[in-house]
């Protein structure tokens, strides 16, 4: 018989996830259907989103060459029935205070940095790059981990060295870029470009750098259709950027620079976001989302 969620001590709430203690060495990592944008948790939820994030992470944890925090399968008997398919039992780690971002293309905050300084996170780039320009080699562009409601801030590699030391910083950069390349190559073979992605790493009890949190999900990555990619324009995306674009477009009536929270998403945007997340999972993994555990009976 599976435990109830109430049997576990609740430790923390994030923008999307809930964290519970299983025992002295393990945590329950639960992905909800919440969606955040521009550091706000939106009033609207995206049905099945937490299951997609979990399914995608499990797929990529198995694909890439890095130790990870998983401590059991998706149907681990320690996972309560009520969160089956959207929860994982993971090892407790000493998390690094750095968001490990890898970028293969110029977009988002990287584009803003480049337009202001000609660099991204202190890395000088050639002149003449535009929205969606592909880099010659992927970049490691770290950021600070912000508290809930605060903005992550891009930092330089030297800042990372100050935070975690030179040896660990070099290991983090090499691992981030290697994992990104593996995932991006796999996605591209299935017609999807991973423009950029964000990883989190921790240190396990043996001192090993360990991949944690979520991996290559539509929340943590920018996914573009490879068949209609074109430099110099906003791309057709499978990820949370679709929601961001609606919020900053004319239909939402929301001023990003004001002090009001974003409005709820209309039903058609909710449905389209759900469809994009599921399509990303199915195209990249080659699996049917309907076969993932925890769905309606």
UniProtKB/Swiss-Prot annotation:
GO terms for molecular function: ATP binding; phosphoribosylaminoimidazolesuccinocarboxamide synthase activity. It catalyses: 5-amino-1-(5-phospho-D-ribosyl)imidazole-4-carboxylate + L-aspartate + ATP = (2S)-2-[5-amino-1-(5-phospho-beta-D-ribosyl)imidazole-4-carboxamido]succinate + ADP + phosphate + 2 H(+). Keywords: ATP-binding, Ligase, Nucleotide-binding, Purine biosynthesis. Gene3D superfamilies: ATP-grasp fold, B domain, Phosphorylase Kinase, domain 1. The keyword Nucleotide-binding applies. CDD domains: SAICAR_synt_Sc (cd01414). This is Phosphoribosylaminoimidazole-succinocarboxamide synthase. It comes from Mycolicibacterium gilvum (strain PYR-GCK).
């Amino acid at each position: 018989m599976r435990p109830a969620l109430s049997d576990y001590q609740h430790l923390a709430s994030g923008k999307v996830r809930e964290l519970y203690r299983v025992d002295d060495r393990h945590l329950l990592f639960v992905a909800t259907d919440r969606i955040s944008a521009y550091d706000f948790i939106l009033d609207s939820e995206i049905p099945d989103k937490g299951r997609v994030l979990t399914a995608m992470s499990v797929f990529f944890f198995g694909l890439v060459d890095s130790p990870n925090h998983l401590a059991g399968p998706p149907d681990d008997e320690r996972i309560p029935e009520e969160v089956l398919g959207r929860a994982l039992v993971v090892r407790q780690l000493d998390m690094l205070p750095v968001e490990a971002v890898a970028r293969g293309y110029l977009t988002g905050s990287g584009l803003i940095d480049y337009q202001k300084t000609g660099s991204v996170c202190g890395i000088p780039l050639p002149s003449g790059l535009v929205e969606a320009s592909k880099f010659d080699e992927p970049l490691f562009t770290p950021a600070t981990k912000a508290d809930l409601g605060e903005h992550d801030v891009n930092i330089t590699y030297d800042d990372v060295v100050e935070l975690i030391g030179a040896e660990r910083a070099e290991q983090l950069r090499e691992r981030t870029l290697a994992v990104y390349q593996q995932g991006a190559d796999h996605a591209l073979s299935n017609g999807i470009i991973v423009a950029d992605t964000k990883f989190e790493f921790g240190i396990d009890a043996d001192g090993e750098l360990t991949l944690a949190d979520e991996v290559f999900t539509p929340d943590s990555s920018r996914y573009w259709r490879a068949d209609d990619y074109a430099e110099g324009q906003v791309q057709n995306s499978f990820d949370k950027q679709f929601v961001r674009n609606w919020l900053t477009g004319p239909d939402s009536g929301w001023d990003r620079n004001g002090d009001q929270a974003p409005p709820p998403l209309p039903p058609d945007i909710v449905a389209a976001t759900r469809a994009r997340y599921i399509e990303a999972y199915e195209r990249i993994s080659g699996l049917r989302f309907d076969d993932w555990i925890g769905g309606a009976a």
